[in-house]
Regions:
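Positively charged n-region of N-terminal signal peptides that target proteins for export
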Residues: 1-4
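Hydrophobic alpha-helical membrane context
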Residues: 14-15, 138
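Cyclophilin-like peptidyl-prolyl cis-trans isomerases
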Residues: 21-241
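C-terminal motif of bacterial Sec signal peptides marking the signal peptidase cleavage site
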Residues: 16-20
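Sec-dependent N-terminal signal peptides
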Residues: 6-13
């Protein structure tokens, strides 16, 4: 009887994980879900200082690419010496990531420019779902309804069949096709989030600090998936590996 009960509990836990990994979406911008959190938005605006949204880059200066492939081991390979990387310094530890600028130059250049300009400084992970992903990058409203790209406007998806939403990959959140801004998410699902492929731009992956990602994903949240205690991005450091 105890074995049967344990098996049932294990099955229910497995179903919970599959639900988290298979039925969620990653959104940014105004949605029904984030609109209902308006009171929380006002509180965040009092606690955090919104950054300017003026353009930092001319999107026409970024050379886009087509049909570029990446190595099969891109999600596990260490960065090469001299390669540009980012260290996301959070209140819970550091997350180090490398970029897929060869297939996602628009997303990569925007992220780097925003980080260098300090627009991600003192922002929060506003949406956290364990066994799915952690989301951040709203530097104006701090609740998932704001932020702007380094181009001062939305930019197109950069989708490649060679870059998938595997565990540890970093991708742009959006409010629909070609609506990328400043918000990004880190895939944390242990079984990968391949069903998101084709709808979101994967532009990097974590090479060190997934233990921090897991810790952030495990914090207590409210009904809007916002951490009860803010998880803060202190700043994002761009440097050579």
């Amino acid at each position: 009887m105890k074995r049967l009960l344990f098996a049932v509990v294990a099955l229910l836990m497995c179903m919970t994980v599959l639900t988290a990994c298979g039925n969620e979406v990653v959104y940014s911008g105004t949605t029904t879900k984030t609109d209902s959190n308006s009171s929380q938005s006002e509180e965040n605006k009092m606690n955090y200082e919104a950054k300017p949204t003026d353009a930092l880059l001319d999107i026409n200066d970024i050379k886009t690419v087509e049909d570029v492939t990446v190595d099969d081991d891109y999600a596990t390979r260490e960065p090469e010496k001299g390669e540009t990387v980012a260290i996301i310094h959070t209140s819970m530890g550091d997350i180090s990531m490398r970029f897929l600028d060869e297939i996602a130059p628009l997303a990569t250049n925007s992220f780097i420019a925003l980080a260098d300009a300090g627009r991600y400084d003192k922002t929060i992970f506003h949406r956290v779902i364990n066994n799915f992903m952690i989301q951040a990058g709203d530097y104006t409203n701090f609740n998932g309804t704001g932020g702007e790209s380094a181009y001062g406007t939305e930019f197109d998806n950069e989708v490649s069949e060679y870059a998938s939403n595997v565990r540890g990959s970093v991708a742009m959140a959006n409010a629909g096709p070609d609506t990328n801004g400043s918000q990004f998410y880190i895939n944390q699902c242990p079984n990968d989030n391949a069903y998101l492929d084709g709808g979101y731009t994967v532009f990097g992956w974590v090479y060190e600090g997934m233990d921090v990602v897991d810790a952030i994903a495990s914090v207590a949240t409210d009904g809007m998936d916002k951490p009860l205690d803010d998880v803060v991005i202190e700043y994002i450091e761009i440097l050579e590996y």
